[in-house]
Every structure is written in C-alpha cells, then in structure tokens.
Amino acid sequence: MQNPPSLGLIDQFHRKINYLRLSITDRCDFRCVYCMNEDMQFLPRDEVLSLEESLRLVKIFTSLGVTKLRVTGGEPLVRKNIAWLFEGLGQIEGLKEIVLTTNGSQLAHHAHMLKMSRVKRINISLDSLDPMLFKKITRTGDLDKVMLGIDEAIKEGFSNLKLNTVLMKDVNDHEAMDLVNFAINKKMDISFIEEMPLGAINHKRKDTFISNDEVLKKLQAHFNLIPTTFTSGGPAKYWQIANQSTKIGFISCLLYTSPSPRD
C-alpha cells in the first residue's frame, strides 16, 4: 500500500509554503548605522549552521514543496567557501528560483559564479550615491566596490536586479530622486524601505524615520507613477514609472498578514 501524497508545508493561515529564507551568517563587512552598533558582537562560529548543513536543509525543504530560496545574512558573500554552497544549490532539482540579498561589496568577485549557479535575482543594498555619505552610513563600505559589483552583475546578464534603499530623514532622503534615476539608467527596480525598529543602534529612530508616504509624495512630483499589482512574492507595493522599465517598491516597517510570502 502506497503512502498518501504529501500536502507539503502548510502554515496556520492555510497557505502553502513554497518560499524559504536562509540566513547563512550574521556577519557583515558593513556596520550600517540603521542596522547595528559599530562594536557589534557576532555569534560564535560553532553556533552557525555549516554550509553542508545549510545545503542539506534546503534539499529537505525542497522535497517538501519549497521552490523559491532567498539567501541572505548578514552579508552572505563574506562566508568562506560560499561558492561551494551556491554551486550545490544550483544543482537541486525542484528549486526553481534562487535569490540573493547582498550589500554588493563582494559582488564583482562572485557575479560569474552566481550566474553559473542559476541565481535568478539579486537585491543590492544602496543607500547613497555620494561616496562620503555612503561611507558615513555604512561606516566601513566602499561605494566604488558596490558600483563595480552592480556593473559586473549586469555584464553577466542578470536582468532581475533590484536596489534596496533605507532612507533616513536629514541623512540621505534628499537622494531619493537621484537613486531612482540611477535605477532607471541601469534598468533596475528599486525599493525604499522604512527604517525598521530592529537591533541596537546609536541614534534615535524617531529623529531619522521618514515614512513611505512622504517619499512617495516627493517622487510623484518628479515622476509619473502608476500603481501596479506586480509582486515579487514579498511585502513591497510597487509603482511603475511611466515609459520606463523601472518599478519603485515601498516596504513598510508595519507588518501584516499577507496571502503571499515575505520578501
């Protein structure tokens, strides 16, 4: 007698789970002011899943119906032997979409490997186009390396590239229009993310918080934005820029129960 077919993974809201988010490290080569203190203490390495364990888990989840994987961190690309993991992920049958979230600092070095490993989409954090301000926000980041990473990803043929930007009042909110124009020129999408009340930081979030509604109003004064029903499977609400391929997404820090999985 055969066992009945598995229904896969179902959550408490009766949604079928086909999306897995895998954080492979809490370590990062940036110390972004909205994310962590400069003297952040990371987990002991022996408390983090090995790459072999991570790959095995993804295979198990794929056998249970997961078809989309997002690899994140920390900064995933600083993990030692990361190429081995992506090469293994790219060989898993049934895994239809692999997505990477990165700060872009190591992207130039890994872009070809990621393309060969069937990574479909890359989200790149970019909070400023000004090298000095970028350094101030990230504390340790080099804007030139991120720009090189973006260009290398484009050269490798990645067409699903998206920028993620955290705007802060009186810090980088004046760059919203320039960042959108940059995305248009690179034929990328861009999402603006409200500063999240997460982690220990060195400033008061109430002083730097700017709502998506404020950002949207500013952008509508310069761009013809058309509401869309487009979704990448996450919480962003998207607007299409008229006569352009670029879409602008807005991600709120207020969480809600959605019929779709989180991005």
Task: Give each language-model segment a name.
Residues 251-255:
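Immediate flanking context of iron-sulfur cluster ligation sites
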Residues 40-44, 130-137, 199-203:
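A short acidic, helix-capping loop that chelates divalent metal ions and anchors anionic groups
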Residues 219-230:
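Short secondary-structure junctions
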Residues 256-263:
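Conserved small/polar residues in nucleotide/adenosyl-binding loops
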Residues 51-70, 78-193:
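Radical SAM/AdoMet-radical enzyme domain recognition
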Residues 169-171, 191-212, 228-242:
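Flexible glycine/acidic-rich beta-alpha junction loops that bind and position SAM and/or redox cofactors
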